[in-house]
Curated annotation (Swiss-Prot):
Keywords: Hydrolase, Metal-binding, Zinc
GO cellular component: cytosol
Species for this entry: Shewanella sp. (strain ANA-3)
Residues the entry annotates as binding substrate: N88, L89, E90
Protein name: Cytidine deaminase
Gene Ontology MF, one: zinc ion binding
InterPro entries: APOBEC/CMP_deaminase_Zn-bd, CMP_dCMP_dom, Cyd/dCyd_deaminase_Zn-bd, Cyt/Deoxycyt_deaminase, Cytidine_deaminase-like, Cytidine_deaminase_bacteria
């Protein structure tokens, strides 16, 4: 079991903890598939809803909040039945807009894993307005059920009445609908190709600034992040922040980053290079490789 879970595992009922420990191996990064979840429910003799709430301390253990020191864990349950953990991330000494909220982390985890819809969000603190707006960008966002400890469950539409969302800006294919934009680039570099593929899968209906970041660690492992825009603009999730959240979930340190690539569209209304460099330089003493590509 990873050291970061030693304290949180003691907060779980013993039967659930005993069943969960084998899953918390060195490669565990917060994903539990539907079959594994069913086995946890059976072994613990708890309901699924009880298990999901009980797992929140495990999700919160993924957090890296050096500024607030407030650990938030979130669990997104997909239509597939799989669950995806996420946690808040803050960059020490940097402006707060670089922060990743736990719900954003969990949703990006699900998106990068190929999930097509979120049906439940379990979180240990009431979603802030920023996260409510971010969730509203998703497929059937208003119908996502929000579950909090010691509170009744409600739909997102309860927490965000009279919501402004993608349809108000004539966007009919919201976040998590698989969409692919093709770009022209002649490269044999696997890391650049990976970034190009993820840029094509990014979500930028408001600026067409399709973009992705890939980070590489010294052992050759890569961690990606895609741009995810929001109808309200400010809650958009930048690809570098998503990549850093991804890396952190996998229990890697920022000091292990040896290479960083940003690929973005030449036809976007904005460029993410400045914000991407700011975030990168806050955590690693390396230069960003910036590649601009043309849509096919």
């Amino acid at each position: 079991m990873q050291d970061r879970f030693i304290k949180s595992i003691t907060q779980l009922p013993t039967p659930l903890a005993d069943a969960l420990i084998p899953l918390l191996h060195q490669n565990f990064a917060g994903h539990i598939d539907a079959q594994q979840l069913a086995e946890l429910v059976q072994s613990s003799k708890m309901t699924e809803a009880e298990v999901l709430l009980a797992l929140l301390p495990i999700a919160a253990a993924l957090a890296k909040p050096p500024i607030s020191e407030f650990y938030v864990g979130a669990i997104a349950k997909g239509k597939s039945g799989d669950i995806y953990m996420g946690a808040n991330l803050e960059l020490l000494g940097e402006a707060l807009f670089h922060s990743v909220h736990a719900e954003q982390s969990a949703i990006s985890h699900a998106w990068l894993s190929g999930e097509s819809q979120i049906v439940d969000m379990i979180v240990n603190a009431s979603p802030c307005g920023h996260c409510r707006q971010f969730m509203n960008e998703l497929v059937e966002g208003g119908q996502i059920k929000i579950h909090l400890p010691s509170q009744d469950s409600h739909l997102l539409s309860y927490y965000l009445p009279y919501a402004f969302g993608p349809k108000d800006l004539n966007v009919q294919s919201p976040l998590l609908v698989k969409q692919e934009t093709e770009f022209a680039l002649d490269s044999s570099d696997p890391m650049v190709i990976e970034a190009l593929d993820h840029a094509g899968l990014s979500y930028a209906p408001y600026t067409q600034s399709y973009a992705a970041v890939v980070l590489e660690t010294a052992d050759g492992a890569t961690y990606c992040g895609r741009y995810a825009e929001n109808a309200a603009f400010n809650p958009s999730m930048l690809p570098m922040q998503m990549a850093l959240s991804n890396l952190t979930r996998h229990n890697r340190d920022f000091g292990e980053i040896r290479r960083a690539v940003l690929v973005e569209s030449s036809q976007g209304k904005i460029s993410l290079v400045g914000a991407t460099m700011d975030a990168l330089h806050a955590v690693a003493a390396i230069e960003l490789e910036h590649i601009v590509v043309d849509p096919v």
